[in-house]
Amino acid sequence: MILLETVIVTGMSGAGKSLAIRAFEDMGFFCIDNLPPQFLPKIAELASASNDKISRIAAVIDIRGGELFDDFKDVLNDLKKGTYNFKVLFLDAHDNVLVQRYKETRRKHPLSFESDGSILEAIQKEREKLEDIKRYADFIIDTSTLSPRDLKEKLFEIFSAQRSRETMLITVMSFGFKYGLPLDADLVFDVRFIPNPFYVEELKHKTGKEKEVKEYVLKWDVTKEFLKKLFDLILFLIPNYAEEGKAQLVIAIGCTGGKHRSVTIAEELFELIKNNGYKASIFHRDIEKDIKG
């Protein structure tokens, strides 16, 4: 009998759970939306007894469940005590992005009745309710800057049947502090102490992926010393995180605008991780935004 694989999809309203569940359908999962958490163990039990007709389940559990959602944490604790093979996926986005999405779709937030119709207040109330649940997440995806296609590709990367379930998913990303911290980062490194190519006229409109910018960023003694210490730390952490059972590791490198220094350092770190035999992906979150350094 195949061990049932279950993905619990949760997170902020407006962060993309509906898009996610459609992506899971495309991957061959049996999908359920707006499932009361108390029903999950029974459904997993029935699926396990289906003679392998159902081997993968994805279920969305969120605050639409009302009072039933209050037992979600207890259900997760009970599942952890059992033999269930499950992962928790938490989708998140910055508050201003969620507000904008609600305005564009003209839909009501599930907690709008508790907040006198204020979308932002409803989002903040939901964030408080989900604070403890987020700690159970095996995977956290910040969808603030992701298109529907980007999100689908990210989910395929994590959950496709071809990916080894024993492999920790490592993502190296660059970002600009002026656009906000990435919500899904496990480790954040600030490289704004490195001399900034933005103030070199011939480099201002290039990115950290281009040779001239790379050479500028990497030539400084402070950069060389930082990379040595960073490489030692990351190569120490990866096997220890994997041993602990961590499923996802997101390493974020930030500079002011996310186009120059952070991009170069992220590229260097990505190559180091690959060259040491680990599977990794790289994502430059803000590289296409207006150049401000």
Swiss-Prot record:
Keywords: ATP-binding, GTP-binding, Nucleotide-binding. GO terms for molecular function: ATP binding; GTP binding. InterPro entries: P-loop_NTPase (IPR027417), RapZ-like (IPR005337), RapZ-like_N (IPR053930), RapZ_C (IPR053931). ATP binds at G11, M12, S13, G14, A15, G16, K17, S18. It holds the Pfam family PapZ_C. GTP binds at D62, I63, R64, G65. It comes from the Bacteria. Belongs to the RapZ-like family. This is Nucleotide-binding protein Csac_1160. It comes from Caldicellulosiruptor saccharolyticus (strain ATCC 43494 / DSM 8903 / Tp8T 6331).
